[in-house]
Design a protein with these regions (language model features):
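Conserved helicase RecA-like core
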Residues: 2-369
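Intrinsically disordered, Lys/Arg-rich low-complexity segments
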Residues: 365-394
Length: 394
């Protein structure tokens, strides 16, 4: 593998990268940064946590000038990812004014700060709000980044994304980064990019370091098994994935009731609550994060040793995204799948698509826990509110 010094970065940027504690570029960084520095359009396919932000961040730090207005726009599907990208960019280039723009918070402070921004990291809904209010000037933008492009499609944001792209002048440099690239992402690239360079680096997880197992268990014992394993498996940080907000809250509430320190994150929480949750988990103040795919996607979290699939995802690609959060940087990782009758079809699709070596484990002796229910009325009203405001709040 090459060194950062070998891929044409400026000394000031090399120093910033050194301060981040990074010594060697990841595969996506070493293959994409040279083309990005040359001003080429790039399509990058790489797993979450593989270093995509640093890759396009080097281009922004090289090409964007301080005190020259808004010159770069990064679109992200979630608020949390917008904040994470902003944090990395500010460390790479402290001279630039980098701003995160997303819904769920007051818009007036954003209007005030946009005047001085050189780089904006935004979710599509709130950025469209600013465009409609004419509180953001796009005429000087020369670099556009679409981060987690596949998730933009999955979350129904792509029409908003296309509206935004059409407001950005040409010529410009356009970068698309995505965990997976399919026909829909390629079609989007054809409409908005010029002779893009394709780079792929999907293997962040070391298969020799990753153990995948499953338990076949009745649905009414699934929570008891999860609690037993969390209390008896030696682990670092743990992520427990559920398919719905309701299950996420149900699992978190019952873990805490059974003396497992856990915290939940999903799209129904306020921005302040989500930010606090991520901070607590990243700081290891709480060892177990219960989450949905949408809420966790794009979050960069180190030192995750165990992934539990309380619910098996319907889309096999989501399974790959989940397990890609462990067995990184030479560390061991373990994926534990809890299968009831409701999960068998999803599990079969995953095995058919990827043919992983997932070993069956024998169910241990379990003491069945008494579960606490989630109040139905509160969740029903929250779901209705989310359906009504989903796009704009993102």
């Amino acid at each position: 593998m090459s060194l950062f010094e070998d891929i044409g970065l400026q000394p000031k940027l090399l120093l910033a990268i050194k301060k981040l504690g990074l010594k060697e570029p990841t595969q996506i960084q070493s293959t994409s940064i040279p083309s990005i520095l040359k001003g080429k359009d790039v399509i990058g396919e790489s797993a979450t946590g593989s270093g995509k932000t640093l890759a396009f961040g080097c281009g922004i730090a090289t090409h964007v000038l301080p005190n020259k207005g808004l010159q770069a726009l990064i679109l992200t599907p979630t608020r949390e990812l917008a904040e994470q990208v902003k944090t990395v960019l500010k460390k790479l280039s402290p001279d630039l004014k980098v701003m995160a723009v997303y819904g769920g918070v007051a818009i007036n402070p954003q209007i005030h700060d946009l005047v001085k921004a050189n780089v904006v990291v935004a979710t599509p809904g709130r950025l469209l709000d600013h465009l409609e209010r004419r509180t953001i000037v796009m005429s000087k933008i020369k670099l556009l980044v679409l981060d987690e492009a596949d998730r933009m499609f999955d979350m129904g944001f792509i029409d908003d994304v296309e509206k935004i792209i059409r407001t950005i002048p040409k010529p410009r440099q356009t970068l698309f980064f995505s965990a997976t690239i399919s026909n829909r992402e390629n079609d989007l690239a054809k409409r908005h990019m010029v002779n893009p360079i394709n780079v792929t680096a999907t293997k962040m997880v070391d298969p020799s370091k990753l153990k995948q197992v499953y338990f076949d268990i009745s649905r009414n014992l699934k929570l008891s098994l999860l609690i037993h394993l969390l209390k008896n498996e030696e682990s670092g940080l743990v992520m427990v994935f559920c398919n719905t907000r309701r299950n996420t809250d149900f699992v978190e509430k019952n873990l805490r009731a059974n003396h497992v320190k856990a915290i939940a994150i999903h799209g129904g929480l306020s921005q302040n609550k989500r930010t606090k949750t991520i901070s607590m988990f990243n700081g290891a103040k709480v060892g177990v994060l219960v989450c949905t795919d949408v809420a966790a996607r794009g979050l960069h979290i180190d030192d995750v040793s165990h992934i539990y699939n309380y619910d098996l995802p319907k889309d096999p690609k989501d399974y790959v995204h989940r397990i890609g959060r462990t067995a990184r940087a030479g560390e061991n990782g373990k994926v534990i799948n809890l299968l009831s009758n409701f999960d068998h079809d999803n599990f079969a699709r995953i095995n058919h698509e990827y043919r992983f070596n997932i070993q069956k484990e024998k169910k241990p002796y379990l003491e069945r826990v008494i579960t606490k229910r989630i109040e139905e009325k509160r969740h029903f009203s929250k779901r209705n509110d989310q359906r009504k405001h989903f796009k704009r709040r993102r």
